[in-house]
Amino acid sequence: CGADTFIRVGTCGGMQPEVKSGDIVIATGAIRMEGTSREYAPIEFPAVPDLTVTNALVDAAQKKGYPFHTGVVQCKDSFYGQHEPEAKPVGYELLNKWEAWKKLGCLASEMESAALFVGASCLKVRVGSCFLVLANQEREKLGLENPVVHDTDMAVQVAVEAVRNLIRTDGKKKE
């Protein structure tokens, strides 16, 4: 017994110009640029959330009328790796990967989802992730508005509404 469904609620940094501070990002997959998930599955195994949980998060964000984006997020170990990468010994690698992820449409950068998605696959449980965008350094580079937003209330509300939806749909399946 125990929990069978998990939702990670947190913060991220935007990577695409259309992803604004205060928006919600719902992950549909995570780039495994961290170390934890490699201890559970080969790097070729994708880090993806449960579709039912992800759809519940999308439905909740739509119901609340919050601005949101769905897509791939970058999951990394270093909180400040993307800030002034040229000052770091592996700056060339950080810069090249950051640019590649942007070109591939990666929406945001965060630190937990890949490990959670792979771990959930191993444990045969459901997981999803939603984030509040704190800021977006790419918008700043383009001279676009980029206020820093720390109020995670919208992301929490999306997760709570998603849990309500999952409880309802799971209950109907048992009937």
Model regions: which residues?
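Glycine-rich phosphate- or other oxyanion-binding loops that anchor nucleotides, phosphorylated ligands
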Residues: 1-175
